[in-house]
Amino acid sequence: MTNTISILGSTGSIGRQTLDVAEQLGLRVAALTANSNVERMEAQCRKFQPRLAVMTEESAAAELKIRLQDTPV
């Protein structure tokens, strides 16, 4: 059984460190949230393949949706 986590503020310093630890421990990432850093969120989504990605800034959410069209996120 794989443990699963969700990370709020994944593009910030603590969120990035948490993702590093999750990767080292082999944890599955179910969800990522961020405010507006679309480039970093896209990279995280492509790497960790969460089921859900949420951006609080509406224009960032729209941009992320376009960028991730080729993924199941």
Please identify what each model-predicted range represents.
Residues M1-A53:
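N-terminal Rossmann-like dinucleotide-binding module
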Residues E39-V73:
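Conserved N-terminal Rossmann-fold NAD(P) cofactor-binding segment
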